[in-house]
Curated annotation (Swiss-Prot):
It comes from Mus musculus. Its main location: nucleus. This is N(6)-adenosine-methyltransferase non-catalytic subunit METTL14. Expressed in testis. Highly expressed in radial glial cells during embryonic cortical neurogenesis. The modification Phosphoserine is found at S399.
Amino acid sequence: MDSRLQEIRERQKLRRQLLAQQLGAESADSIGAVLNSKDEQREIAETRETCRASYDTSAPNSKRKCLDEGETDEDKVEEYKDELEMQQEEENLPYEEEIYKDSSTFLKGTQSLNPHNDYCQHFVDTGHRPQNFIRDVGLADRFEEYPKLRELIRLKDELIAKSNTPPMYLQADIEAFDIRELTPKFDVILLEPPLEEYYRETGITANEKCWTWDDIMKLEIDEIAAPRSFIFLWCGSGEGLDLGRVCLRKWGYRRCEDICWIKTNKNNPGKTKTLDPKAVFQRTKEHCLMGIKGTVKRSTDGDFIHANVDIDLIITEEPEIGNIEKPVEIFHIIEHFCLGRRRLHLFGRDSTIRPGWLTVGPTLTNSNYNAETYASYFSAPNSYLTGCTEEIERLRPKSPPPKSKSDRGGGAPRGGGRGGTSAGRGRERNRSNFRGERGGFRGGRGGTHRGGFTPR
């Protein structure tokens, strides 16, 4: 808590220093002397109104400056002529164009000691992107204030580490390699193709073959996907948003989520160094489309998926120019969500080899994949699932139970006749002498049933 408070104070101090620099104040403590108070603004407005009234010849005499004692009309006319001449001389002065120096004119809330955070203008002035100021984006501190979620993530990571298969990898040219040789069928497929868009933005020559979307569509992903499975496709931030959806439909998937990678530039603030010639804005994000195949419901298929554990945003520092690697957090999102152990990563690299995954890519430097050995990890019934503990099941977010027709009214049948102890409109009262809203027995005064006798 103390470190968090210290961080807030340091940011506040930095904002006051920037504001003092923009307003021309000597220090952050002298900002109040530079800013005008409400009374001073009112005096300035009254002075301006008085000057306008004195220059306006059509204004009534009551709004003009009163004549001093002994002043004649001729003196007044001469004085007014002098004022008009001075005004005309000022208008004839050459026009001086104002040069933009800082954003003090555009700051919001400058009449207070704590101006509002205008992150867009701050980006124009300093080059710091607005997403730089989002707190608790790392995996370590994201759930610091949510102890149940933090415990859930810890337990799931331990279970995943125990159930992971040894890492396997295969160096292969995916364009020439028949991916149907990969067995068995996979529960999760992650595609990270080296799109032309990545190198077009950086302006650096690619050290591997760039893939077009026509090439990606030719992959027979549907032949290696399990009947119920998920796919994650990195598609950039341009034309891939539309063409990636076309690929999912061709392979038999339905798009269900769009995971967005937001890139910060805390370590290297400034404008984007390289711009895509086909882009309209500076692109600071990438998209990963998620598709679902088969019938998977989060309310009934808790043995295969755990929904709502992670969010659909990844916020990390932008990699160096020419580095097209994706954040490692995408693996955590996939492993936390899908409990299937048969995971395939296409277009992987040496840096992405990971326990529990089969990595295939042309840039890998070695191979250890054996189809029989890999298939033996899933030979037992339901061995393709990681399983779940009672504690994880208790902590994980769940869908609300479905409402049946019998639960619609609270337990009692609708109608129930117009008499008897079950009468009423489906509202069950937790009382032994419940009388329905309509019908039922009514006795006189007294007795256990307000009549003193047992009803017929």
